[in-house]
Amino acid sequence: MLLLLAEYLQQFHTGFAVVQYLTLRGILGVLTALILALCLGPWMIRTLQIRQIGQAVRDDGPQSHLSKKGTPTMGGALILSAIAISTLLWADLSNRYVWTVLAVTLLFGAIGWVDDYRKVIEKNSRGLPSRWKYFWQSVFGLGAALFLYMTAQTPAETTLILPLIKTIEIPLGAAFIVLTYFVIVGSSNAVNLTDGLDGLAIMPTVMVGGALGIFCYLSGNVKFAEYLLIPSVAGAGELIVFCGALIGAGLGFLWFNTYPAQVFMGDVGALALGAALGTIAVIVRQEVVLFIMGGVFVMETLSVMIQVASFKLTGKRVFRMAPIHHHFELKGWPEPRVIVRFWIITVVLVLIGLATLKLR
């Protein structure tokens, strides 16, 4: 929006041309979303408290969590609002990737909002029934996959790239739709499973989102892409604005979500942010790198799958409680220790993911 205004104002002063620079708009995206989140956060928390929109706590979970009962939830709406406003202000709104990622984010956020609403407002412990949750996730995930497949301008946009073996490219054809569906929906649910402790999900999301922003910038630049042997995706660079907004909104939310949390993001935030990461990774053809950098999300998801499978097959549990962050709590780790150690793991994994740019 402001890019169009700057282009118009260039006829009066050439200084407005600076707004065209992607890096500047990425930084402005961070700052705008951060300021919005910090300014709107206190108002949203008060509103949630007044309306008694508070978190329910499982009785069979760690005893330390009982004090969290009633903490305002659905704070993910703050994150999504800051991301959307900042992106609409600073991104090139003629870019199809910007609209794709923004649409997927908000649509998955809508699924989470309905789930949270039923749990918190209607006091329905089931929330949105799983079959309907996965149905709408599938509808929106497949919709995004079909759109990206149908609008692909080069074979590289639907080719699977393997880090460290960049000379091997696997044309996916229609299988691209299937892979994209699983990446988006899987990433959405993985982040949601991770969102169980104060700040546990949002900081890894910010770090992975920032790293994906670097991939977007490099993939959108033909020279960088050719030099690094990564797919050149015209227009992908514009997603650095969205990634910047995600970073700013995430850090602003963390201000209130850090231990002890004043607000939780709820499904409205977790499902949306996970879907956003998955969609961006698909666009820049870095699904495998997302799997690496989002290792904490993968670990949380696998712990649930292993726990369920083990209990159904043997009647025994592998972990004291799943997702795995609760296992460590029940082992006696204080909540802040679990959180920070998972953050440290993410820092290492993100650095490994970025290192694949040069390793070949």
Curated annotation (Swiss-Prot):
Query: Can you name the source organism?
Result: Azotobacter vinelandii (strain DJ / ATCC BAA-1303)
Enzyme Commission no: 2.7.8.13
Annotated keywords: Cell cycle, Cell division, Cell inner membrane, Cell membrane, Cell shape, Cell wall biogenesis/degradation, Magnesium, Membrane, Metal-binding, Peptidoglycan synthesis, Transferase, Transmembrane, Transmembrane helix
The name this protein goes by in its record: Phospho-N-acetylmuramoyl-pentapeptide-transferase
Role according to the record: Catalyzes the initial step of the lipid cycle reactions in the biosynthesis of the cell wall peptidoglycan: transfers peptidoglycan precursor phospho-MurNAc-pentapeptide from UDP-MurNAc-pentapeptide onto the lipid carrier undecaprenyl phosphate, yielding undecaprenyl-pyrophosphoryl-MurNAc-pentapeptide, known as lipid I.
Its UniProt pathway annotation is: Cell wall biogenesis; peptidoglycan biosynthesis
- Catalytic activities: UDP-N-acetyl-alpha-D-muramoyl-L-alanyl-gamma-D-glutamyl-meso-2,6-diaminopimeloyl-D-alanyl-D-alanine + di-trans,octa-cis-undecaprenyl phosphate = di-trans,octa-cis-undecaprenyl diphospho-N-acetyl-alpha-D-muramoyl-L-alanyl-D-glutamyl-meso-2,6-diaminopimeloyl-D-alanyl-D-alanine + UMP
Q: Where in the cell is it found?
A: Cell inner membrane
How does the entry describe its membrane topology? Multi-pass membrane protein
**An individual GO BP term:** regulation of cell shape
Q: Keyword check for Signal, yes or no.
A: no
* GO CC annotation terms, alphabetical: plasma membrane
Q: Where are the transmembrane segments?
A: 25-45, 73-93, 97-117, 132-152, 167-187, 199-219, 236-256, 263-283, 288-308, 338-358
Task: Please tell me which top-level EC class this enzyme sits in.
Answer: transferase
- Cite a single Pfam family from the UniProt record: Glycos_transf_4
